[in-house]
């Protein structure tokens, strides 16, 4: 019973904070004077993508910032190649991002890092949020190299990187 009360109180605080931020930013939104602009980068996985979207939306609310959700669709993730269940999860995650006030950007590219960096420059992104990279023994070297490359490219643009658990 105590857990339910705590959850209810937390939900009420979250809703109250969102309403307060919405009222505060109503005037700001007309002039597009956001100081921070967050970008959540997702893949076609259900739970990890949903978690990244929710945490980025929460961060954007705390920071009084706008956020976008980027899905970079590679050739191996073409709609005719991924299972219908994953397609459904992806659409549900896009809808979730829109419901939470984010903009969904879907780009077809096999160059994920360059796409992320280009969008950061184009949209003046201040913070990129990703889920933790998946390391396996087989792909440890390649994944580490790509991660370092992303980190270095974002550092040159003075863009922060947040790795969400």
Regions from the language model: what does each represent?
Residues 1-17, 21, 128-165:
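Gly/Ser-rich helix-loop-strand patches that form or flank binding pockets
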Residues 41-45, 109, 131-134, 165:
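Structural motif
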Residues 5-31, 100-128:
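Structural beta-alpha unit
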Residues 68-70, 103-108, 160-164:
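General small-molecule cofactor/ligand-binding pocket signal
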Residues 31-87, 94-98, 105:
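Small/aliphatic-rich secondary-structure junction motif
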Residues 55, 85-89, 142-148:
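Charged helix-capping and loop-helix junction motifs
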């Amino acid at each position: 019973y105590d857990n339910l009360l705590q959850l209810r109180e937390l939900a009420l605080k979250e809703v109250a904070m969102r309403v307060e931020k919405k009222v505060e930013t109503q005037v700001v939104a007309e002039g597009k004077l956001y100081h921070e602009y967050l970008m959540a980068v997702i893949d076609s996985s259900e739970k990890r993508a949903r978690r990244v979207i929710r945490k980025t939306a929460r961060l954007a609310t705390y920071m009084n910032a706008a956020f976008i959700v980027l899905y970079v669709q590679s050739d191996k993730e073409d709609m005719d190649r991924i299972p219908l269940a994953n397609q459904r999860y992806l659409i549900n995650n896009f809808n979730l991002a829109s419901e939470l006030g984010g903009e969904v950007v879907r780009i077809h590219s096999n160059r994920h890092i360059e796409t992320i960096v280009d969008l950061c420059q184009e949209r003046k992104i201040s913070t990129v949020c990703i889920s933790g990279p998946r390391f396996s023994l087989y792909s440890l070297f390649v994944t580490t190299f790509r991660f370092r490359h992303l980190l270095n490219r974002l550092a040159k643009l003075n863009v922060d990187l947040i790795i969400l658990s």
